[in-house]
Curated annotation (Swiss-Prot):
Amino-acid biosynthesis is among the record's keywords: no
Protein's name according to its UniProt entry: Glutamyl-Q tRNA(Asp) synthetase
Classification via HAMAP family: Glu_Q_tRNA_synth
Biological source species: Corynebacterium diphtheriae (strain ATCC 700971 / NCTC 13129 / Biotype gravis)
Binding site for ATP: 244
Length: 297
């Protein structure tokens, strides 16, 4: 193992108990950090205040501790970092967006638009047009969203497993509008990773398409992008992403969860220290793990 002194992290969203897929990703994040001589940190991603709860966060931290997982500083919480995001926003080119979700969906059906990307409806409005839309929202008790004014269509990142990745960059949301403005995930995660010294991000490969956007934000903010490691998801028998509706899949419902995580990683050890001794990231399978509810270890 190396002696590099960067940091990896696990950053759960506290909206419920950790399930098998969450625990597997947490273990992989810990293994990668320790294998490369990095510190390991926990950040509670409760930037979405309406879906997060301190009770869920406490239960998740208890579960990670019960696995034998350790971290090198007290867990941090995004709800304490809003001043950071406000400061970052001041350093980013942005504009107000008055579109509803329905507006964006309808605009995205127009010819020559890229599915899933914001079509730029509010990007070049005149100040008179902006004031009209601002007042219309105010009558509804809402405020505009804030979007990045991106000056490139794509951005390049390198992932440990996927290699070179060129991904789309659009005018992404930085702060959501509505009755209660919320900071957007892409901005929050980039700002927090930089502030916390995170230089290794291990997470599910469903987030691979977010990496170019986040790396571009890091570039605009003048901070280094982390090394990305996107790992396969855990799927149910139907080939869909594992969810709580699939049955007894949470850690608290599975007393044998760590041995099963080890099995899914091709490791024979049944403790985290033992798994670390065996772990070789270059031998880790890149195929999704199919979770069998009643499978015996």
């Amino acid at each position: 193992m190396g002696t590099f002194q960067g940091a990896g992290r696990y950053a759960p969203s506290p909206s419920g108990d950790l399930h098998f897929g969450n625990v597997r990703t947490a273990v992989l994040a810990w293994l990668f950090a320790r294998h490369t001589g990095r510190r390991f940190l926990i950040r509670v991603e409760d930037v979405d205040t309406q879906r997060s709860s301190l009770e869920s966060a406490a239960r998740q931290l208890e579960d990670l501790h019960a696995l034998g997982m350790d971290w090198d500083a007290a867990p941090t919480y995004q709800h304490n970092n809003f001043d950071r995001y406000e400061q970052a926003l001041r350093n980013l080119p942005h504009y107000e967006c008055y579109c509803s979700r329905k507006d964006i969906q309808e605009a995205s059906r127009a010819p020559h638009t890229i599915p899933g990307q914001y079509p730029g409806t509010c990007r070049n409005l005149t100040e008179v047009q902006r004031e009209e839309r601002r007042q219309a929202l105010a009558k509804q008790g809402r405020v505009p969203a804030l979007r990045l004014r991106a000056d490139v269509p794509t951005w390049h990142v390198r992932d440990y497993y996927a290699g070179d990745v060129l991904g789309d960059v659009d005018d992404m949301i930085l702060r959501r509008g509505g009755q209660q403005p919320d900071w957007a995930y892409n901005l929050a995660v980039v700002v927090d990773d930089a502030a916390d010294g995170i230089d290794q991000v291990v997470r599910g490969n469903d987030l691979l398409t977010s990496a170019p956007r986040q790396a571009y934000l890091a570039h605009l903010l003048g901070v280094p992008a982390p090394t990305y490691v996107h790992v396969p998801l855990v799927l149910n028998a139907a080939g869909q992403r594992l969810a709580k509706r699939d049955g007894a899949v949470t850690m608290r419902e599975m007393p044998d969860i760590l041995p099963r995580v080890a099995e899914s990683l091709g490791l024979s050890a049944r403790t985290l220290p033992g798994m670390l001794e065996e772990f070789d990231p270059d031998r880790f399978s890149q195929q999704p793990w199919i979770f069998a509810i009643h499978k015996e270890v």
